[in-house]
């Protein structure tokens, strides 16, 4: 059996595995853990009362986080003409059309988000096998296929959490960084969960927000009391 590291021992000494924390308590614990050489993300997992095997219970969307994510994202936009100019003015890092598609096919993937104007999807559609597995394929459900590419760029740059329920019925996304205040994380979590409640499928029965877990990249998963987040505040 491998020995626990000093950091792992400290983590174990600080958490109660059976306890349900408030987000404020969880953020305090994550922020107080020994720092690593890189800035860790604060991630949230929300177990939903859905059956993702049913097409009408697949929950997918995007939330504009009030406090941002703490990370600067590089945004690529497929657009031409006035839409391309608007994307550039909004701060897009890469703007193109067929030329951008060829660059991606050649292996150039220096971006975190891909946005496309509707008329660009005939070009973007050729990239499904490249962008799809990386979670980068533009989709109208998360606002990345839109005639208003400038607004989409601004949202991505400001801090947006995209999510899609996995096979286990869980949403995973990033809502901040270690070093964020509890208030910042609470604002982001509440915005996300509010959007999730609004996205509840009509066919979903029983408790919808079943379980919430907060964690850092290399830290523990802390169970959050879900009851306060099951109804609108």
From Swiss-Prot:
Q: Superkingdom, according to UniProt?
A: Bacteria
Q: Which UniProt keywords apply?
A: Repressor, Ribonucleoprotein, Ribosomal protein, RNA-binding, rRNA-binding, Translation regulation, tRNA-binding
Q: Which GO terms describe its molecular function?
A: rRNA binding; structural constituent of ribosome; tRNA binding
Q: Which Pfam families match?
A: Ribosomal_L1
Task: State its role.
Answer: Binds directly to 23S rRNA. The L1 stalk is quite mobile in the ribosome, and is involved in E site tRNA release.
The record, for InterPro entries, names: Ribosom_uL1_bac-type (IPR005878), Ribosomal_uL1 (IPR002143), Ribosomal_uL1-like (IPR023674), Ribosomal_uL1/biogenesis (IPR028364), Ribosomal_uL1_3-a/b-sand (IPR016095), Ribosomal_uL1_CS (IPR023673)
Cellular component aspect of the GO annotation: cytosolic large ribosomal subunit
Summary of subunit composition and partner proteins: Part of the 50S ribosomal subunit.
Against Gene3D superfamilies, the record matches this protein to: 3.30.190.20, 3.40.50.790
What is this protein's name? Large ribosomal subunit protein uL1
For biological process, the GO terms are:
regulation of translation; translation
Source species of the chain: Psychrobacter cryohalolentis (strain ATCC BAA-1226 / DSM 17306 / VKM B-2378 / K5)
Family of this protein: Belongs to the universal ribosomal protein uL1 family.
Q: Which residues form the signal peptide?
A: none
